[in-house]
């Protein structure tokens, strides 16, 4: 039975080979064009994503960037930061982490203090973010954030996560966002980073706050649709896997050099 199957397979392969040779002989130009086109499509597909498939991280990593990081919140629960910092694959390691601190007027992420301390202790650059609630006073939200986060030299500037406008007009939303940014900048001495999705940015924020660094979320794209935004960070996936973290985690890249990255963490005022 085994010999019969093997012979049948060989015969099938021979027929396919003869058929391919016949096609090439009859339609040489068309065949060459087909294979060339297919090769280009494969190349473009690979280039479309960047493209470095990294098995351990379970995602494709944009290949044009060398500085990689994650962002986390209570949804990742208890993180083993030592394992996160030690993870390496295909020349890629995680160098920074943005950590959720607060939301709205009252919510403090239950894992923030632990994440804030251990990420730094294990050698990652760290940043803290506030999820902006459009229905709550911007000044109240800024005070909550500043009371929660103890900035130290070497930390990223504060981050404001703007993803919804509720019942506000885009103009009113921008006014409240501006209030938060100015309060936090005055206290920390550094312009905060603004995080938003590409679509929300285009609809509500494009053309404003150009003096601030941007962190854009746009998944599974060759590059983010930035609509003229001079972005510094790109959240390119929400499906990454990292040692020491249960479940999926957001992945980000920094758009710049190591020296430029250092500029982000220089000069922030320490806060109690």
From Swiss-Prot:
Active site, UniProt feature: 71, 163
GO BP: any one term: cell wall macromolecule catabolic process
Keyword set, alphabetical order: Glycosidase, Hydrolase
Claim: rRNA processing is one of the keywords in the record: no
Transmembrane segments: none
Stored SMART domains: Glyco_25 (SM00641)
Pfam families reported in the protein's UniProt record: Glyco_hydro_25
CDD domains reported for this sequence: GH25_YegX-like (cd06524)
GO molecular function, one term: lysozyme activity
Annotated coiled-coil segments of the chain: none
Taxonomic superkingdom: Bacteria
InterPro entries the record matches: Glyco_hydro_25, Glyco_hydro_25_AS, Glyco_hydro_fam25_subgr, Glycoside_hydrolase_SF
Protein family (similarity comment): Belongs to the glycosyl hydrolase 25 family.
Protein name per UniProt: Uncharacterized protein YegX
Protein's organism: Escherichia coli O6:H1 (strain CFT073 / ATCC 700928 / UPEC)
Gene this protein is translated from: yegX
